[in-house]
């Protein structure tokens, strides 16, 4: 079983406008290095989820429950109900679509207003960095991420650029916050669940890279 040997389960969501490539990012990550580029998938209807087990540098093995949310306004009432049970959020925009970038603050505010900023690890993700028709600069995105107190990374599911790194960065940050007591287990909160106890996993001291992709 995928959860065998996993100490925790982390719920992580991808949020952003429709068409920014959230589903492609998730499928690329779950498929791993064996995955191949695929045609643009159909838009997500409501919420779908994937899972993957991950061995962290500190020695801890965790199960990731990865939630793919619809970006269309007609599904927002459905997806909002899931926000309070997320511990990690990738806020995704399309570097070739300025409007999707301008909506990031609204997506961020929706999560914060649901459960506050303390329980959630955020990462701003500029997707489709392989395309040469960008209308959002890396500098502008970095400035927005800094103003919201999160890291920034550029990715491309098509070229498999920084896809693993984006998810692994969020996961390691969650694990570190958990070990430091900044995130606490709560039986009424599904963001982090204890699957079985492990013998004192040491906290990771490795700093997370948040460099941009040279696509």
Swiss-Prot record:
Keywords in alphabetical order: GTP-binding, Hydrolase, Lipoprotein, Magnesium, Membrane, Metal-binding, Nucleotide-binding, Prenylation
Family matches, as SUPFAM superfamilies: P-loop containing nucleoside triphosphate hydrolases
Enzyme class: hydrolase
Binding site for GTP: 19, 21-23, 44, 71, 128, 130, 157-158
Primary localisation category: membrane
Subcellular location: Membrane
Lipidation (S-geranylgeranyl cysteine): 213, 215
Signal peptide stretch: none
UniProt-listed Enzyme Commission number(s): 3.6.5.2
Record remark: domains: Switch I, switch II and the interswitch regions are characteristic of Rab GTPases and mediate the interactions with Rab downstream effectors. The switch regions undergo conformational changes upon nucleotide binding which drive interaction with specific sets of effector proteins, with most effectors only binding to GTP-bound Rab.
UniProt protein name: Ras-related protein Rab-42
Upper lineage: Eukaryota, Metazoa, Chordata, Craniata, Vertebrata
Gene designation per UniProt: Rab42
């Amino acid at each position: 079983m995928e959860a065998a040997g996993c100490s925790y389960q982390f719920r992580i969501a991808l949020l952003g406008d429709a068409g920014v490539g959230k589903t492609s990012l998730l499928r690329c990550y779950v498929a791993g290095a064996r995955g191949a580029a695929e045609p643009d998938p159909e838009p997500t209807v409501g919420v779908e989820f994937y899972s993957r087990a991950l061995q962290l540098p500190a020695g801890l093995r965790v199960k990731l429950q990865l939630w793919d949310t619809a970006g269309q306004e007609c599904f927002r009432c459905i997806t909002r109900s899931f926000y309070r049970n997320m511990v990690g959020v990738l806020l995704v925009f399309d570097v070739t679509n300025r409007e999707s970038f301008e909506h990031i603050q609204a997506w961020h505010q929706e999560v914060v207003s649901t459960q506050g900023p303390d329980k959630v690890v955020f990462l701003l993700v500029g997707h489709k960095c392989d395309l040469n028709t960008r209308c959002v600069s890396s500098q502008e995105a970095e400035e927005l991420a800094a103003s919201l107190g999160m890291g920034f990374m550029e990715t491309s599911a098509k070229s498999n650029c920084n896809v693993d790194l984006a998810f692994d960065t969020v996961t390691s940050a969650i694990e570190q916050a958990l070990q430091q007591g900044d995130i606490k287990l709560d039986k009424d909160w599904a963001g982090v669940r204890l699957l079985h106890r492990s013998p004192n996993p040491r906290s990771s001291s490795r700093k997370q890279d948040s460099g941009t992709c040279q696509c």
